[in-house]
Amino acid sequence: MANIAKKYAKALFDTAKDADILDDMYDEFSTINEAVQSENKKLQALDADPQKDVEQRRRFVSIVFGQTNQYLQNMLTILASNRHLGHIHEIYIAFETLYNEEHNQDYAVIESVYQLSEEELSSIEEIIKARTKLSKIMITNKINPELIGGIRVKVGTKVMDASIKNDLAQLERQFIRVK
């Protein structure tokens, strides 16, 4: 489904960009994604229910998502027709990735032993921006006492580990090689 999700996301992204409503589309799709998170199992059950024909699934979309913009509603109707409503979250993730690339931004998770101050987070954000060339970073600070000290930063698929735990692990590997 990952490839299918990317195709739906790309089509919606391109359509929104061409119509000059990309930011509005992102906001609206984010709202829908949040709303369906807790109902995903029900959507998958609706997809799998052989007693629900195409028209019933389309009517469901029209009733539940009738207030959304036309492009998003069209995509949701196609998802209903193809029994893919249970994949809204995957499509949203792929759409969000495209949106973040377009706006040169990404999420960063900063793990530390204690809650970092706004000043510390701001300093780390500037370092991340310099290393990744991103213009905007959305930061989450997670507490991880296993690090012993220091921080570990995850941005996309990249990890920058400046923790004492990592330093000790590297020392251990060096000692093993020396033997």
Swiss-Prot record:
An example Gene Ontology CC term for this record: plasma membrane
Cleavable signal peptide: none
Membrane topology is: Peripheral membrane protein
InterPro entries recorded:
ATP_synth_OSCP/delta_N_sf, ATPase_OSCP/d_CS, ATPase_OSCP/dsu
Which SUPFAM superfamilies has this protein been placed in?
A: N-terminal domain of the delta subunit of the F1F0-ATP synthase
User: In which broad location class does this protein mainly occur, judging by the first location in its UniProt entry?
Assistant: membrane
Record GO terms (molecular function): proton-transporting ATP synthase activity, rotational mechanism
Q: Where in the cell is it found?
A: Cell membrane
Sorted alphabetically, the keyword list is: ATP synthesis, Cell membrane, CF(1), Hydrogen ion transport, Ion transport, Membrane, Transport
Q: Does the keyword Metal-binding apply?
A: no
Keyword Cell wall biogenesis/degradation in annotation: no
Disulphide bridges: none
Q: What is the protein's known function?
A: F(1)F(0) ATP synthase produces ATP from ADP in the presence of a proton or sodium gradient. F-type ATPases consist of two structural domains, F(1) containing the extramembraneous catalytic core and F(0) containing the membrane proton channel, linked together by a central stalk and a peripheral stalk. During catalysis, ATP synthesis in the catalytic domain of F(1) is coupled via a rotary mechanism of the central stalk subunits to proton translocation.
UniProt similarity note: Belongs to the ATPase delta chain family.
HAMAP family reported for this sequence = ATP_synth_delta_bact
Give the record's subunit note: F-type ATPases have 2 components, F(1) - the catalytic core - and F(0) - the membrane proton channel. F(1) has five subunits: alpha(3), beta(3), gamma(1), delta(1), epsilon(1). F(0) has three main subunits: a(1), b(2) and c(10-14). The alpha and beta chains form an alternating ring which encloses part of the gamma chain. F(1) is attached to F(0) by a central stalk formed by the gamma and epsilon chains, while a peripheral stalk is formed by the delta and b chains.
The protein's name in its UniProt record: ATP synthase subunit delta
